[in-house]
């Protein structure tokens, strides 16, 4: 074939790709024609109704009765079509659609994922300026979750929380938040220059578990700021908590909105809420302005994939977009993005029944395990902030067996292959999801029965372990510098003994659950040090500290 003919034979297939960057609807439809899904002139599609019933000029790709039963979600379809092109790829990433993939990695995951590990090609849209399949995927997610707008996140819920706080709080503003918030909320205050107004959640002494925050606590915090001549820029609520405890968001949102204060909900553990009558209501249905959900935790997206949802007019959407563009990678992984689209579609296809089996298995497991001698099941802790609990989060107490949660977890993992999600001093927590099988439940029950039968082999928990209030380290939080000031201040290293009373210069956080105990700018207390040393001795991993042995700390030079 002559060079002229060669040029002509390929021109029709590939010139349209490289001449239309950024995304252009008319030219990007070709790769999706095979599936009957085109963004522009679309087969089996009609114009859609926009948010709040306003007619939209966009064309919806939502499947209708005439559409193929095998129709793929928009971003999944676009990624599949692009990967199937017979392309001569002179673009990133360097493995070149798997042709140069490391053999050790292909032995682990095969070669197919590399075909779909593509950059922001024109037909795949742009995460930060979406016009095509990403835009459509996010719109479909917004409709499913009840948002006016949804953003896909490839930096986990961490970047979603950071963006939400940066979009609502400016330097010097005050954010009301629980003292046991995730590390992402603390890093957000460093990034934004926001000042914290902490609420200390109620604490269940028997379980060594913190609850959510109450409407009365939020109201009190707002009033205290008003007496100081200040107004909260936003309120952050963690609901559900890692243990599945849900706050009364309906009342909290009503209180905040009466003061024109937006409510951000860290709903990382609750992307599934509202999709079954036995599940608690979602935060958006209760009035939250912003909700950040880890779609990978209970739903079926890939790890690190999350969503940020918005509704109402108290938050500037453009500021959210600008914040996300600063915080997220400029080279987002399209497998992560496509997994969000696929997880949304999976729920949409069978939203009324998809959680039936999972909930039944969780309730069955709780019923069987609650009858085992010496075992406690977290259902109704003794505090008022316990408004609701997620039935798919199951916390088992083992202190009556003379075991710590860390010891019980070690036995279950080594002897029964049961892997827990969260381990505490007195309990361990299990996360049920759509992939939970009956065999998993049977192994769990057998393992817990074994713990009970062999309890005579264990020494009773020491009184200082049984009776200590581990949440007491948050009782006397004193801030000498803002988190941002302390983060950038000059530091010096001192021994743990000499650190008492000094200003903490680092963020010290046991993980899981990722709740910081010492934050830059706070005075180091004996209670905080005692808790960190004890939980580390029980097997927790301490993150953030320059000295992971905790023999020394970084403190601020004043």
Model-based region annotation:
Residues 241, 346, 400-401, 434-438:
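A generic structural motif
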Residues 411-415, 420-558:
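PLP-dependent enzyme catalytic core of the Aspartate aminotransferase-like
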